């Protein structure tokens, strides 16, 4: 086992604070509408330019292991805030630094660290309740656009695009961000259900100019099995041909003789058919087939429930107004499934989301809800260079997370004003002893830090602005973009309540752990460990000499 380096008490805390400050100072320059850029060197390719707090935090690794421990713990604050609300990483880092700095001063002055932590926790719990009381619902497009604009560093086009996307696909809809091809940002909306499976044979194409298969009012056969024998399908094909409608086959696979016969029938014009593989794998494929069945009013033909393909009738087939299939995707538009059945299926999947333990499962389930409930919107980010594209894409993703958080828990006045109001309301909060009171004061003082940092990044004097804002009430605050005072909500400076709440809670959680740290242990650097080993060996040799 490698030799360890151990530090205690004040020595440990000083080192830890140094690491916290390095990381926080690098991150906090990005805060606010006039936040600065940070350039990150990459081992290959061009450097990345970003104003995203968590991207900066992730890059920081310090040489001194004790300092690095402090930095990594604050990095955890940024990551947790990002995971919970998708934004507010810089605010969380600024709050953590402020609480840790003031808290460690109090510990150095002889306060009891455990009581300080209890005081901080008490203040934060009360602050969260006050934030909820200040919160106003965010339901209209204008408010959604304003939240998106603020989170995307005052880029109005991004805010408007996100609001438009939410209008088109609903609050539950899936909105994805992709690289665009031009200089302008674009919004693409895919109505209906789309999944990532294309046609099984290019001979199904009936729109050569677009390279797509388009079926108007088709029947849809859903089979949870491989189809290789055409005889299984003859009864269904004959019934569909008599009805004079096209047929879409969605199965685990269609191969060999079955696929060849379908192609020949299509080319001869006997019956218009297209076949695609079912989306997903394993249990997820079964679930997605069931989703499509619910959407189209059909039944999944599955041998597991004793249904055979030869006995399928037109009643077992789903229907839709239109289906478009290209090389990679299939889109089913306006399925004829009953609204009540679709809503029941959506409620069932939402229940599974509540119970899901992994982020991946949760994300996949949310995609399924969106496909059933509304559709998918794609924001295509335009930029002149790849470096700008990466930076802008990160901002759009942040803005998207922020708007979702705003819809979920509402909004409060932005620009750090909500925390200032909360702190002033809690001025009379008291703990069980004097040390806890100091902890409460530490937390309340730290709540001014985001506003002060926003002002500092503008090049103004933080204390002057903070005192002016404290002198006002309600939503009165400082608009750093225009450098004027006024009602933050009227000026469209909004923060999602969830983002502010998460930032405060995670900052206080990690700060409390660091304030109560009394000992730090790390591996000795390799050179020091080698020197120790060499010294031990020399002593042994001296003993040998004595024996001679």
From Swiss-Prot:
**EC number(s) given by UniProt:** 5.6.1.7
Q: How is it modified after translation?
A: Phosphorylated reversibly during heat shock.
For this UniProt entry, what is the primary localization, expressed as one broad class?
A: cytoplasm
Look up keyword Nucleotide-binding and say if it applies. Answer: yes
Indicate which residues the UniProt annotation says bind ATP: 30-33, 51, 87-91, 415, 479-481, 495
PTM sites of type N6-acetyllysine: 117
Q: Which reaction does it catalyse?
A: ATP + H2O + a folded polypeptide = ADP + phosphate + an unfolded polypeptide
| Localization in the cell | Cytoplasm
> What keywords tag this UniProt record?
Acetylation, ATP-binding, Chaperone, Cytoplasm, Isomerase, Nucleotide-binding
Q: What does this protein do?
A: Together with its co-chaperonin GroES, plays an essential role in assisting protein folding. The GroEL-GroES system forms a nano-cage that allows encapsulation of the non-native substrate proteins and provides a physical environment optimized to promote and accelerate protein folding, probably by preventing aggregation and by entropically destabilizing folding intermediates. Also plays a role in coupling between replication of the F plasmid and cell division of the cell.
- Cited PANTHER family: 60 KDA HEAT SHOCK PROTEIN, MITOCHONDRIAL (PTHR45633)
Query: By what name is this protein known?
Result: Chaperonin GroEL
- Please report the organism this UniProt entry assigns to the protein: Escherichia coli (strain K12)
Taxonomic lineage of the native organism: Bacteria, Pseudomonadati, Pseudomonadota, Gammaproteobacteria, Enterobacterales
